Amino acid sequence: MENMAEEELLPLEKEEVEVAQVQVPTPARDSAGVPAPAPDSALDSAPTPASAPAPAPALAQAPALSPSLASAPEEAKSKRHISIQRQLADLENLAFVTDGNFDSASSLNSDNLDAGNRQACPLCPKEKFRACNSHKLRRHLQNLHWKVSVEFEGYRMCICHLPCRPVKPNIIGEQITSKMGAHYHCIICSATITRRTDMLGHVRRHMNKGETKSSYIAASTAKPPKEILKEADTDVQVCPNYSIPQKTDSYFNPKMKLNRQLIFCTLAALAEERKPLECLDAFGATGIMGLQWAKHLGNAVKVTINDLNENSVTLIQENCHLNKLKVVVDSKEKEKSDDILEEGEKNLGNIKVTKMDANVLMHLRSFDFIHLDPFGTSVNYLDSAFRNIRNLGIVSVTSTDISSLYAKAQHVARRHYGCNIVRTEYYKELAARIVVAAVARAAARCNKGIEVLFAVALEHFVLVVVRVLRGPTSADETAKKIQYLIHCQWCEERIFQKDGNMVEENPYRQLPCNCHGSMPGKTAIELGPLWSSSLFNTGFLKRMLFESLHHGLDDIQTLIKTLIFESECTPQSQFSIHASSNVNKQEENGVFIKTTDDTTTDNYIAQGKRKSNEMITNLGKKQKTDVSTEHPPFYYNIHRHSIKGMNMPKLKKFLCYLSQAGFRVSRTHFDPMGVRTDAPLMQFKSILLKYSTPTYTGGQSESHVQSASEDTVTERVEMSVNDKAEASGCRRW
């Protein structure tokens, strides 16, 4: 009998019932047998006395038919459980249906209509909640069912206590029939979930996969519409879950806009040297980067967008047609695509889309410009990138494995980059030098050297752009610039280790600080190997600034200007671009930009051919004029070295004080409160103390502090250094 009662409570399903259709529920089954259901016409014609109570409906006829979600087509009606409602009033109406006026979208418990004016809960069996007055029932529905519901797209999935059949199959694949307690019914896949937290995670997984309607129940459902995003006058279609790389094939990150604009300016500056350029976006995803190249640079570039995923390749082709760019596979298809071009439609350019492994493609073809932006580290693709890159070509590498580069996962950095790293105050520049060192080693293995044009390390990525110099001599010169760094753990002073193969007896003498003599134990560690040379090319950065002004990229102009100040190691107030006799001076937005006349196609030989000795010599002279004296490596954080009990000066004033003291100084993009200078740490803290004011004076004038003797200043600096060292030592040990 218990099994029979459970069977009576199981939901009964009927197919193809209209939304507005009115039904009279069939009588409950008895223990003797279950009669066949009468046809709809018989049910409609059956008289119902007004005085007699309505017959009891079938127990737990739960999953009645209802229209599917608004996003589904009308012909694909999906079944919705009665526990899924839009408003609390809809849930209350289930319990107050009288005299055969039953909504086809609802199904009632057999105890809904009891003697008198008592009603039973439509979502609870009689054993759990007996029939009661209307005000009690409303309070029960609101407190027990509605308040603990899960909301999704305007619907509320309320908690259900009916003994419904589990829809989710077991491990073998069969559906288990077992008695269930409180549970939820999923509006998307009709699965039964017991806990609310599990239901939230279940719905969230549906959203991550882009499943926003009942695709499991509906016979025919349309795919979720693709969203169209616009960046730099380029439209791209993206999937609903485009921001989650683990859940989508076409990952698109809006936070990488600065990265895309920097690479575009790099390519635009290179296009002024020689045309046309063979460009490769090795990991296309949505193809946004290659589309911007082809749309704004036109015939100056020949763009190839590659991706290994078939869905991404299809999406790239759709985005090409969306931006009126023709997809070229071979010459025949190019001719056909030109014939298909509609009247009045303008062909902005051609893009070659390939579905191939990036390593295989870079081995098969040679390029002038290669951009690598894999998901994670890029060390697996560096050897292939330098294998066929043309002479004086450019390779840009975007690394998003910031957990290892920023010393959060040190063992991963040792595994991928073969370097030792710890968390320091200059960890972002340390990450950039680690990536450049890996790029330099990969180029040297292919008998090529590199010249670093710029390196940027921001919150989400590390971008390194290098120019390739062919020849074993350039490779040897590049390899010599990879050195180890000695870092003091007490005061965070640092210096690159001297060249030589001989083992030094006391490497602590290379550090400017005397922490090893005043502190117990070993005070310094060896980091690296790292890139020890310059990270910026001033001449190339100025050309990038001109391209950003020319194309109206306002977002990165401030960043490029900061890079120029950093490469010259000069304060912003002293920034100026001097024009020479062979330089065209242009003014745009109040900034003077120079463009050289000798950077034309005459200075470069055709694709893949080597230069003559005379042209290589001229190029070397040009590079020497572009690059000024190398900037000092690394920087100091002014907050980290502030004096206890003193109000430090403003950063802009402090830069002037360091410059007046005879040191090179500039701000850095790696740290908003960082100061790049060639001053030792002791001098840095001495000047910082000299122009700081005591906190208890309430804004004491600087002249009083400057009148202190040099001996007193030195003593206080040493005391502050020792205090900082002891504090940092306590944290480390």
Swiss-Prot record:
GO terms for cellular component: nucleolus; nucleus. It comes from the Eukaryota. The modification Phosphothreonine is found at residue 26. One of its GO terms (biological process) is tRNA N2-guanine methylation. Residues 39-49, 57-73 have a biased composition (Low complexity). A motif (Nucleolar localization signal) lies at residues 135-139. It is found in: Nucleus, Nucleolus. The modification Phosphoserine is found at residues 66, 612, 707. Widely expressed. Changing residue 373 to A: Abolished tRNA guanine-dimethyltransferase activity. Residues 1-78 are annotated as: Disordered. Disulfide bonds: none annotated. Gene3D superfamilies: N2,N2-dimethylguanosine tRNA methyltransferase, C-terminal domain (3.30.56.70), Vaccinia Virus protein VP39 (3.40.50.150). Residues 1-18 have a biased composition (Acidic residues). Keywords: Isopeptide bond, Metal-binding, Methyltransferase, Nucleus, Phosphoprotein, RNA-binding, S-adenosyl-L-methionine, Transferase, tRNA processing, tRNA-binding, Ubl conjugation, Zinc, Zinc-finger. It catalyses: guanosine(27) in tRNA(Tyr) + 2 S-adenosyl-L-methionine = N(2)-dimethylguanosine(27) in tRNA(Tyr) + 2 S-adenosyl-L-homocysteine + 2 H(+). Changing residue 512 to L: Found in patients with early-onset neurodegenerative symptoms; uncertain significance; reduced ability to maintain acp3U without affecting tRNA guanine-dimethyltransferase activity. Transmembrane segments: none annotated. PROSITE patterns: SAM_MT_TRM1, ZINC_FINGER_C2H2_1, ZINC_FINGER_C2H2_2. One of its GO terms (molecular function) is zinc ion binding. S-adenosyl-L-methionine binds at residues 260, 307, 357-358. A zinc finger (C2H2-type) spans 184-206. Its EC number is 2.1.1.-. Specifically dimethylates a single guanine residue at position 27 of tRNA(Tyr) using S-adenosyl-L-methionine as donor of the methyl groups. Dimethylation at position 27 of tRNA(Tyr) is required for efficient translation of tyrosine codons. Also required to maintain 3-(3-amino-3-carboxypropyl)uridine (acp3U) in the D-loop of several cytoplasmic tRNAs. Belongs to the class I-like SAM-binding methyltransferase superfamily. Trm1 family. This is tRNA (guanine(27)-N(2))-dimethyltransferase. The lineage of its organism: Eukaryota, Metazoa, Chordata, Craniata, Vertebrata.
